[in-house]
């Protein structure tokens, strides 16, 4: 495992997980609003 690859991959993984978290949270809010 190249350390440079890890330096590049780590921020990408953080950004991707943060984006998915926000999308999931918004989706849950929309579902709750529709079912309410």
Curated annotation (Swiss-Prot):
Q: Which residues lie on this side of the membrane: Stromal?
A: 24-36
Q: What is this protein called?
A: Photosystem II reaction center protein Y
| Pfam families per the UniProt record, alphabetical | PsbY
Keyword entries, A-Z:
Chloroplast, Membrane, Photosynthesis, Photosystem II, Plastid, Thylakoid, Transmembrane, Transmembrane helix
Q: What is the lineage of its organism?
A: Eukaryota, Sar, Stramenopiles, Ochrophyta, Bacillariophyta
Can you state the subunit structure given in the record?
PSII is composed of 1 copy each of membrane proteins PsbA, PsbB, PsbC, PsbD, PsbE, PsbF, PsbH, PsbI, PsbJ, PsbK, PsbL, PsbM, PsbT, PsbX, PsbY, PsbZ, Psb30/Ycf12, at least 3 peripheral proteins of the oxygen-evolving complex and a large number of cofactors. It forms dimeric complexes.
The record's annotation in InterPro entries points to: PSII_PsbY (IPR009388)
Please give the start and end residues of each transmembrane region: 5-23
Q: Which residues lie on this side of the membrane: Lumenal?
A: 1-4
Lineage: superkingdom? Eukaryota
Q: How does it sit in the membrane?
A: Single-pass membrane protein
Q: Which gene encodes it?
A: psbY-A
Which cellular components does GO assign to this protein? chloroplast thylakoid membrane; photosystem II
Looking up HAMAP family in the UniProt record yields: PSII_PsbY
Q: Which organism is it from?
A: Trieres chinensis (Marine centric diatom)
What are the GO MF terms of this UniProt record? manganese ion binding
The record's function comment reads: Loosely associated component of the core of photosystem II (PSII), it is not always seen in crystals. PSII is a light-driven water plastoquinone oxidoreductase, using light energy to abstract electrons from H(2)O, generating a proton gradient subsequently used for ATP formation.
Q: Which family does it belong to?
A: Belongs to the PsbY family.
Localisation per UniProt entry: Plastid, Chloroplast thylakoid membrane
Specify where it is mainly localized: plastid
Disulphide connectivity of cysteines = none
Single GO biological process annotation from the record:
photosynthesis
């Amino acid at each position: 495992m190249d350390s440079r690859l890890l330096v590049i991959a780590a921020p990408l993984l953080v950004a991707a997980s943060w984006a998915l978290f926000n999308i999931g949270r918004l989706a849950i809010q929309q579902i709750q609003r529709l079912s309410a």
